């Protein structure tokens, strides 16, 4: 298909993966160390364009603290296992989603045959959240584990 017609007809692109959900019956909350927070921030911001001031790592940390923190501190979750989850620590599934809305600028890049890296950069600037980023937010919310997110999403 020619790039012009393809770009003109494309509205959105959706990717999704399923991850195992943490058992809510045995889920335990612990304080997150500064090192763990730094590693998660590194993982989350890995795909961000390096030369764009709109992507502020410190603002992201503050936002996470507001949305996911407990008593002014970031927390992490672990599940030792219980009778409700058959001692696995996991029960059910949750979806990770990546939705790329085709904006005017993305359409132009597709029509001119831009490389995948350029398309991803523009999609991130336009507000797309990657599978990994959606997964990390679900880790911070206590829905799934970082191991699950890493196993099902690429960097």
Describe the predicted segments one by one.
Residues 1-155:
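Short, flexible helix-loop junctions that flank or precede catalytic/ligand sites
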């Amino acid at each position: 298909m020619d790039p012009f017609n393809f770009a003109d007809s494309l509205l959105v692109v959706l990717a999704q993966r399923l991850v195992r959900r943490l058992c809510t019956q045995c889920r335990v909350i612990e304080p997150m160390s500064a090192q763990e927070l730094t590693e998660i921030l590194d993982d989350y911001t890995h795909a961000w364009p390096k030369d764009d001031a709109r992507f502020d790592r410190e603002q992201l940390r503050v936002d996470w603290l507001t949305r996911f923190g407990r008593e002014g501190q970031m927390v992490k979750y672990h599940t030792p296992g219980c009778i409700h989850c058959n001692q696995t620590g996991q029960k059910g599934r949750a979806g990770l989603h990546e939705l790329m809305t085709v904006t005017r600028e993305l359409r132009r890049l597709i029509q001119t045959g831009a490389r995948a890296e350029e398309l991803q950069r523009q999609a991130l600037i336009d507000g797309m959240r990657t599978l990994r980023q959606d997964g990390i937010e679900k880790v911070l919310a206590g829905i799934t584990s970082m191991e699950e997110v890493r196993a099902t999403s690429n960097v």
